[in-house]
Amino acid sequence: MEIKEISVPQQGVVADYMNGKKEIQSCFDYMLTEDAFKQRVQDLREREFFRQDLVAHLLEYNTKLQAGEATIQNVKALGDEDTYVVIAGQQAGLLTGPLYTIHKIISVLQLAKEKEESLGVKVVPVFWIAGEDHDMDEINHTFVTKNKKIKKTIFHDRNPKKASASESELSLEDCRKWIEEIFKTYPETNFTKDVLQFIDDSLGESNTYVDFFGHLIMKMFINSGLILVDSHHPELRKLEVPFFKQIISKYKEVQEGLHNQQEVIKELGYKPIIETKSNAVHIFMEIDNERVLLEDNQGKFVGKDGTYSFSYEELIEEMERSPERFSNNVVTRPLMQEYVFPTLAFIGGPGELAYWSELQQVFHTIGFRMPPVVPRITITYIERDIATDLHDLQLQESDPFLNNVDKLRENWLSNQIEEPIDERFVEAKKEIIDIHKSLQQFVKKIDPGLSSFAGKNEFKINEQIELLERMLKRNVEKKHEVELNKFRRIQFAIRPLGAPQERVWNVCYYLNQFGLDFVDRVMENSFSWNGKHHVIKL
């Protein structure tokens, strides 16, 4: 593997944060400097965590996922008062979801290792699976290439239930068929059989979406020491009850903190992305298998416009009796993470970084400082045939990132023709229309009754010119079909659907192409934290 860094333009909060703009950096409690991380360790030493209870739960959960010895040792290390975590999270996408999930985990592993060495304290990597999520449409699919088009392949469970990812049972038979359909779109390689067995082993050990995700990730990172946590596990929820109570008792202050911080963001020229009602409580409650967001209504906690209503005492009583019925929203999830884990750093994507900038005063309301927020490592893989296509078209590896691939294609095609087709036909249409307008005036003078027919005649002539233009373009494209197919392959590989590769393609394609140790070999590279994009030639 050969790795190269390129600068890809970013916008908004992320761009200004990475460029060191003081105004946006003031919305975070720590700069990304070594001194700031040292200060973070000191700040965490002054706080108390329920470490032993957490360790007991994580040991049981990770052992169930057949964690490697390094993971078990890291979980046990969390019981020590001077052990800290680098953490990131994601929904439980089928087959692990888009590549950026894998890249988040790689980011967590690398930063944890680096900070352990530089700070001289134990730092363990943790990945938080968002098991409370009920939106199956966000996790039940993957993208494949079929018939020279990118297709969204959705898993349709025969017995769908309205439940969280932690509780939604998978039909193993249906899921196996879905996986087979996906692999039919991949080329058969020397690794295909082993990869399918690898996936099937994980599926066979699973009952739910989160189980399947957890088993796959654990097998993929078996020797890394990665700790997994299901945010909606009933045993974890029991440990979180005291903090849920705290949020319920301070929900007005939480909402006020969010509002005030969003005003700061607006004054700095950014548009807030978290949308909440002014009476939001920022906690979900599961009612009749539905995740209902609670709101304040004259001292009562209500859901679904008053369909459900609880007093403070009733809500607290239900929390103590059935904590698994409660979960956090986008505002309180980071707070719960901060309550549960001694977090040295949180790693997030561009969207997460933007919405965390709106949470500073929310953290302060609860008495926390926001942990250092580190943008995750971004990666694009370029296979050998795509590198050859780039070379043949005299394109640099950075060109598809800095330019629209369709525009690159159009520019290349126009350079193959002496005179631009579009311009020549625009001129021709104008000249012909001018002549025809004059002709219509003449016809109108001689026989006004033919005016309508003359107008239709102009339309027909214009239609024929456009048909000629389309036929000419089609023939030119056919002449250069080999080269234009190279542009299509480049777009599909590097900018599928006009998006970054890591937001569309799934890691299983690369496991099938390069073997089950693909992720291990990617992790052998050293990635920088300078905000640049990493291009890996395979």
UniProtKB/Swiss-Prot annotation:
Family label: Belongs to the BshC family.
Enzyme Commission code: 6.-.-.-
The UniProt record lists the keyword Glycosyltransferase: no
NCBIfam families listed in its UniProt record: thiol_BshC (TIGR03998)
Keyword Coiled coil: yes
Chain's role: Involved in bacillithiol (BSH) biosynthesis. May catalyze the last step of the pathway, the addition of cysteine to glucosamine malate (GlcN-Mal) to generate BSH.
Uppermost EC category: ligase
InterPro entries in the cross-refs: Bacillithiol_biosynth_BshC (IPR011199), CC_BshC (IPR055399), Rossmann-like_BshC (IPR055398)
Protein name per UniProt: Putative cysteine ligase BshC
Superkingdom to which the source organism belongs: Bacteria
Residues of the signal peptide: none
Gene symbol of the encoding locus: bshC
Entry coiled-coil feature ranges: 460-484
Ranges annotated as spanning the membrane: none
UniProt KW keywords: Coiled coil, Ligase
